[in-house]
């Protein structure tokens, strides 16, 4: 799994449910959190624990792009690993376009 591939396959056509399914297939519920985090890091994300909720690891991948062949923007994929004990209990993913 690579976020660049997920963006190519699903991002531009706004198929978030399909992207969520691809990430969920790579990170099954019950997987050890360190293993899930390692997969996301290899996929290109940067991960850190959320300060307010230490049972959640938030991983962010960003990619620079242009809009209308001129305007700079960042595509940002955020994946949150919700842990229960040392295992993945839930995964949430979102995509945002940050226009400059």
Which residue ranges define each predicted feature?
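A cross-family detector of function-defining hotspots
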Residues: 33, 37-78, 94-100
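Short amphipathic alpha-helical surface micro-motifs
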Residues: 8, 28-29, 40-42
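Active-site rim elements
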Residues: 23
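Soluble non-cytosolic domains of exported or imported proteins
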Residues: 13, 17, 26-34
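Short, exposed beta-strand-loop hairpins at the edges of beta-sheets
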Residues: 78-87
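Membrane-helix boundary/juxtamembrane interface motif
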Residues: 11-14, 87-100
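Compositionally biased P/S/T/G-rich terminal and signal peptide-adjacent segments
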Residues: 1-18
